[in-house]
Amino acid sequence: MADASAPDKKNAPTNALKPDLIKIAVERVLAAIDTENNEDLILAAAREPREVVAARAPDLFTSAAYSWSEEDELGTRMRASSFFPVASMFAKIICCLFLLWAKSCTGHGAMVTGLTACTGAYAIASLLCSFVVYYNVRTDNMPFGTYTKLFQIAACIGCGCYALGLTMEKLFGDSEMYFALFPDAKNSPLVGATAKGSALILPQGCSVAPYVPLAVSVAYCAAVVYDIADTIFPLLWVRTTLNEFAVF
């Protein structure tokens, strides 16, 4: 007769697997509970109102970091952005040279004196701004600060208003536009008139001299308008798009 206390060989493997199955089931239940809790936390966080802190535009323009890429090591963008201001200054100098030639022919030197002084003042202001831009970029800051930008705007508007006023006065007030529009006016006593009222005969090769003040005035005023627009319009664009004033 077999011993009743001996273990049943058929039931032994089944009894051994029961603790493992229970452990696996408990782990799955706990994992499901954790997953459900995480989902509840995510949904609760999504329902909670969040405080949105708006970034101010001036904070975005405080550093020049990452403004250069690997493909831009030679400063191609800097050359492209400085081409038109340099061209504007070059056009002003050429205009002054043409007026100097016209002065030698007609004797009218008020416009060349005033525009040369205006060009010199603008060149000095541009040179000072260039030094400030160079220093700020080397120190990883934006090119212009608030006071430097205000100085640049004041210089552009001041020189521009003076140049526009001078050209309008000399063309319309002193009849120089009349000289340019009517070729026969060069033989009138108004052109190069002396104190006695006699007419001066224009030297040979100066037949186009009466046209120079009008053409130069148009070109110079166009350059002045560009300078003002190039200084002010970017600030207005940032104000319109970002609703903030930013200096850069």
UniProtKB/Swiss-Prot annotation:
**Pfam families referenced in this protein's UniProt entry, alphabetically:** Herpes_UL20 (PF04544)
- Quote the InterPro entries the UniProt record gives: Herpes_UL20
Q: Does the keyword ATP-binding apply?
A: no
Q: Which family does it belong to?
A: Belongs to the alphaherpesvirinae UL20 family.
Q: Which residues cross the membrane?
A: 82-102, 114-134, 153-173, 218-238
Tell me how this protein sits in the membrane: Multi-pass membrane protein
Q: Give the function comment from the record.
A: Plays an essential role in egress of virus particles from the nucleus, cytoplasmic envelopment and virus-induced cell fusion. Forms a functional protein complex with gK and this interaction is absolutely essential for their coordinate intracellular transport, gK glycosylation, expression on host cell surface, and function. Together, they modulate gB-mediated virus-induced cell fusion and virion egress and therefore actively participate in these processes.
Q: How does it assemble?
A: Interacts with gK (via N-terminus); this interaction plays a role in the coordinate transport of UL20 and gK to the trans-Golgi network (TGN), and is required for their cell surface expression. Interacts with gB.
Q: Does the keyword Membrane apply?
A: yes
Which cell locations does it reside in? Virion; Host cell membrane; Host endosome membrane; Host Golgi apparatus membrane
UniProt keywords (A-Z) are: Host cell membrane, Host endosome, Host Golgi apparatus, Host membrane, Host nucleus, Membrane, Transmembrane, Transmembrane helix, Virion
GO terms in the biological process aspect are:
viral life cycle
Q: What is this protein called?
A: Protein UL20
Q: Which gene encodes it?
A: UL20
- GO cellular component annotations of the record: host cell endosome membrane; host cell Golgi membrane; host cell nuclear membrane; host cell plasma membrane; membrane; virion component
